[in-house]
């Protein structure tokens, strides 16, 4: 029992420590100027993150004696390519939204992963969902809307933060691409025997290649290397960002493997809350009383979603046992 609790504690500290540090680095790099100049090359940031994730994934597989040779089989290439493209687009839209939204708004908005999925299925495929899913989406959307609207009306002064409709639209497309990525991954997992870490390696390898090609193409005029030459301190931040994100992914896989999805859902939920609070207090974002109501609505919505998922998993497990 002591060993079990010790492993769980290590997983919790690993996930919290990695992803809270990752979020701080991400917000600093994207939203804070370096000697008066802001970093404007999300592609380089995505390349650093995906390269480090591939490296960590290969080390994980090597440690567990898992071969990655099957990644280049023709039957996987089509799937991996499409996942890499949708994941790269998701990353692009996500980073682009940060130039038009405050970071707390982005964190809250990313909690509403159900919105684009339900919108796509309802309006395109004419599919219906259980009432609780509509309730969850309504609560989270209302919370994000309240927070974003009052971000604009309460922000004043030279360094005021403002959320624009363009930013919210970009965030919607980020979530939509996320949904497409996850759906395709589920299809691959259902069709082939493939570990999550191997999938992570393949997808991030594709993302690294796509971003690398973009950075050396004539379409890229952001000159990220010139920015690094002018502000070399960003290299340390980028390295911390890439390392903490990659290590956090490994802690997630380890937690899922050792303790199951219910424990992981609980840890992920509390991690989102801590990330939001850390952003507000560490970077001194101004949050009004009504905006705290919006935050509360969002976290009530994702708590309801997590609770129902846990209940559903428990009932499924009982049915299998009987």
From Swiss-Prot:
GO terms for biological process: UDP-galactose transmembrane transport; UDP-glucose transmembrane transport into endoplasmic reticulum. InterPro entries: SCL35B1-4/HUT1 (IPR013657). Its main location: endoplasmic reticulum. It is found in: Endoplasmic reticulum membrane. GO terms for molecular function: UDP-galactose transmembrane transporter activity; UDP-glucose transmembrane transporter activity. It is a multi-pass membrane protein. Glycans are attached at residues 152, 313-314. The chain crosses the membrane at residues 4-24, 43-63, 76-96, 105-125, 129-149, 164-184, 199-219, 250-270, 290-310. Coiled coil: none annotated. Keywords: Endoplasmic reticulum, Glycoprotein, Membrane, Sugar transport, Transmembrane, Transmembrane helix, Transport. GO terms for cellular component: endoplasmic reticulum; endoplasmic reticulum membrane; Golgi membrane. Belongs to the nucleotide-sugar transporter family. SLC35B subfamily. May be involved in specific transport of UDP-Gal from the cytosol to the Golgi lumen. Involved in the maintenance of optimal conditions for the folding of secretory pathway proteins in the endoplasmic reticulum. This is UDP-galactose transporter homolog 1. It comes from Schizosaccharomyces pombe (strain 972 / ATCC 24843) (Fission yeast). The gene is hut1.
């Amino acid at each position: 029992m002591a060993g079990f609790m010790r492993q769980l504690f290590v997983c919790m500290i690993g996930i919290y420590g990695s992803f809270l540090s990752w979020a701080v680095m991400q917000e600093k790099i994207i939203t804070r100027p370096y000697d008066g100049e802001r970093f404007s090359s999300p592609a380089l940031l995505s390349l650093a993150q995906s390269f480090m994730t591939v490296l960590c994934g290969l080390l994980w597989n090597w440690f567990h004696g898992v071969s990655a040779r099957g990644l280049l089989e023709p039957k996987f290439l089509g799937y991996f390519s499409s996942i890499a493209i949708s994941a790269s687009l998701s990353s692009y839209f996500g980073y682009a939204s940060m130039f038009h939204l405050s970071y707390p708004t982005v964190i809250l908005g990313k909690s509403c992963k159900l919105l684009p999925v339900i919108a796509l299925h309802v309006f395109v495929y004419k599919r219906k969902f259980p009432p609780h899913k509509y309730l969850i989406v309504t609560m989270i959307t209302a919370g994000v809307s309240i927070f974003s609207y009052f971000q604009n009306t309460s922000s004043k002064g030279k360094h005021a933060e403002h959320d624009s409709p363009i930013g919210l639209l970009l965030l919607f497309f980020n979530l939509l691409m996320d949904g497409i990525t996850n759906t395709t991954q589920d299809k691959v997992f259902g069709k082939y025997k493939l570990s999550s870490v191997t999938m992570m390696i393949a997808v991030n390898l594709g993302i690294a290649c796509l971003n690398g090609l973009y950075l050396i193409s004539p379409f890229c005029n952001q000159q990220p290397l010139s920015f690094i030459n002018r502000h070399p301190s960003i290299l340390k931040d980028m390295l911390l960002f890439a390392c903490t994100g990659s290590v956090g992914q490994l802690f997630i896989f380890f937690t899922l493997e050792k303790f199951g999805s219910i424990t992981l859902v609980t840890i992920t939920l509390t991690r989102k809350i801590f990330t939001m609070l850390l952003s507000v207090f560490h970077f001194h974002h101004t949050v009004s009383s009504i905006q705290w109501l919006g935050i509360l609505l969002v976290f009530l919505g994702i708590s309801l979603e997590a609770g129902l998922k846990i209940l559903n998993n428990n009932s499924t497990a009982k049915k299998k046992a009987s």
